[in-house]
Regions:
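Feature recognizes metal-dependent phosphohydrolase scaffolds
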Residues: 1-427
Length: 427
């Protein structure tokens, strides 16, 4: 989700539509309006006019909704549908613009029979749960209407010139990376794309193939290009499109699924169509040879190195363990997000790394302050000790410690050069 906000802050249309839609989906539009001061009135006005006779029943917000404010809920649903349709349109334009992304299977609006209210996928016809598409021209389904274009231009402007948002995004670019090697551990969000046989999958970017660490590096370079490039607009545009690629493409190490079934989840009943097949990585991450291959690719010692993996929620309530491959890999899931707590059964993990070793702390969900006070409960956490060292780790054993030792060695060499007269003193 970070990369989506980063793309949105650069002014990328598809990323902006996704950000606004997800905020509407989880009843978080106040984050945009009150938190960042982003004006959503043009979108609200358009949604009220365009969908005034549409109940938009498929677009209820998830999570906590203030049912006492019915008018606000109705507006949220209309805004939600309006931005979702705009998203499918601008994403379709992007997919057509970038055939090298290999995402033609996500062009869905042209597969709809708007008279019958059905869609044909892989030769099979499915009925749509919502058949009202007043802004879609069947002859040119990916074209924005004049009103949608106005709303889109407005959103691009307010996202690009929101000072508070830009400050946060510059912080992410300054401090963040797609992966990080730290104190013998490799941290990444999603996966390292693999082939069916467990080897690194090659992904073509701008005519050249990349795999493993190189794929991470080129995608990060292009994402930064999409945000910071000011002179070469062609390069900037490609970098912006790459941020959306990172968000949703099956070859993205951050996403790691065959498709993002957003359209299917809204409009279709068939459960199989909603499934998002995971990358082969998830079939291999219990295999020590594959994990060692990944550790070596990123320059870590296979005997002591660890991988800290995010992205995939761990279904603790079903008995799933966050510790994989005999303790070489740990999955830290998104359980702090309420949306995932029904899946996981907990409120996420914290990985603690200190001089004593490694331990995982699993947290119970926090319901509300009222519940805590009324039931006199506390937030409990269960600790799992992963490995306990016999000798405590010292500062000199860490990455920072090694950097300090290198500085000390440099200073000693400098002192020696002065003492030998190799460097003359300035008087």
């Amino acid at each position: 989700h970070d990369i989506l906000w980063m793309g949105a802050a650069s002014g990328h249309r598809a990323c902006i539509c996704n950000v606004v839609r997800i905020c509407a989906r989880y009843n978080n539009l106040d984050v945009l309006e009150n938190g960042y001061g982003i004006n959503l009135i043009p979108l609200a006005r358009f949604a009220l006019e365009c969908y005034k006779d549409d109940e938009c029943e498929l677009f209820h917000a998830s999570g906590e909704v203030d049912e006492s404010n019915i008018r606000e809920e109705e507006l949220n649903k209309k805004m939600h549908k309006a931005i979702a349709i705009m998203q499918f349109k601008v994403e379709g334009q992007l997919i057509k613009r970038r055939p090298d992304f290999l995402m033609d299977q996500r062009l869905l609006l042209d597969k709809i029979d708007y008279e019958k209210g059905t869609i044909t996928l892989d030769g099979k016809e499915y009925e749509l749960k919502d058949k009202n598409f007043p802004t879609i021209d069947p002859n040119d389904p990916y074209k924005l209407t004049k009103e949608e274009e106005y709303v889109m231009e407005h959103l691009v402007t307010v996202f690009k010139y929101c000072a508070y948002l830009q400050e946060h995004i510059r912080f992410l670019f300054a401090k963040g990376h797609l992966y990080k090697v730290f104190n013998g551990m490799l941290l990444y969000h999603g996966c390292v794309p693999l082939n069916e046989d467990g080897t690194f999958r090659e992904v073509e970017i701008e005519g050249r193939k990349y795999a493993g660490k190189e794929l991470y590096d080129v995608l990060e370079h292009l994402a930064r290009q999409g945000y910071y490039e000011e002179k070469d607009m062609k390069s900037r545009k490609y970098g912006q499109d790459i941020m959306w690629f990172i968000w949703s493409n099956e070859n993205s190490p951050v996403y790691g699924k065959a498709k993002m079934a957003t359209f299917e989840r809204y409009f279709l009943d068939d459960a199989d169509l909603k499934k998002e097949k995971k990358d082969y990585y998830y079939q291999w991450y219990e295999n020590e040879a594959v994990i060692n291959q990944i550790l070596e690719e990123f320059g870590l010692d296979t005997s002591t190195g660890k991988i800290v993996n995010g992205h995939m929620p761990v279904a603790v309530k079903k008995g799933e363990s966050p510790i994989k491959c005999g303790g070489k890999l740990f999955v830290i899931d998104g359980g702090f997000s309420k949306a995932y707590q029904k899946t996981t059964g907990i409120a996420g993990y914290t990985l603690v790394s200190n001089s004593y070793g490694l331990k995982l702390v699993a947290h119970e969900p926090f319901v509300s302050r009222t519940t805590v006070i009324r039931e006199e409960t506390d937030i409990h956490s269960d600790t799992i000790v992963i490995n306990k060292v016999t000798k405590r780790k010292c500062v000199m054993d860490t990455d920072n410690g090694k950097a300090l030792q290198e500085k000390v060695a440099d200073l000693k060499q400098l002192l020696w050069a002065y003492q030998k007269g190799l460097i003359t003193e300035r008087i």
